[in-house]
Amino acid sequence: MKDHAIVIADQHGVIQHWSEGAAQLIGYPRDEAIGQRVDLIVPPEFREKHWHGFGNAMQGGPVEPAGAFFDLPVRCRSGETKVLRGQLHILRSEQRGPIGAMAILASP
C-alpha cells in the first residue's frame, strides 16, 4: 500500500492518520501532517466546496460520490497541485454517527 495515500481526519477535519504512501505521494512527512487540518492538502480554490461537503457529511448528510472513484486535486508540500484518483469513506461510530473521514488516493 506504499503507492496509496491513506489519510484519516476526525469530525473536525484534523488529520489523525497519515500513511507512508501519503508521505510519498503528497510530500509531507507524517509528523508534519498529523494534527493539521486537511486544509494542508486542499488547494485554496477548493476549500469552500470541501468544507461545505465535509460539514454536510459530518452532520449525517449524503456523500457524493459515495464509495465511487473520482479525481481529487491535492496540494503537495512542494506547492504544486496534483490530481490523485481515489475514494472517500465516512467513518462511523457503533451508533452509526459520523466520526471522521478516510481518503484512499493513488496516482492515476
Give residue spans per PLM region.
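PAS/PAS-like sensory domain cap-loop motif
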Residues: G21-A33
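Terminal output helix/cap of sensory domains in signal transduction proteins
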Residues: P44-P73, S78
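PAS-family sensory/regulatory domains
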Residues: E32-E48
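Conserved hydrophobic beta-strand signature of PAS-family and PAS-like sensory domains
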Residues: I6, V14-Q16
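Glycine-biased flexible loop/turn sites that connect beta-strands or occur in inter-domain linkers
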Residues: S78-G79, R96
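PAS/PAS-like sensory domains across diverse signaling proteins
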Residues: H12-V14, Q24
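Short loop/turn elements at sensory-signaling interfaces that couple input to output
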Residues: R85-M102
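Conserved beta-strand cores of small sensory beta-sandwich domains that regulate signal transduction
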Residues: A5-A9, P73
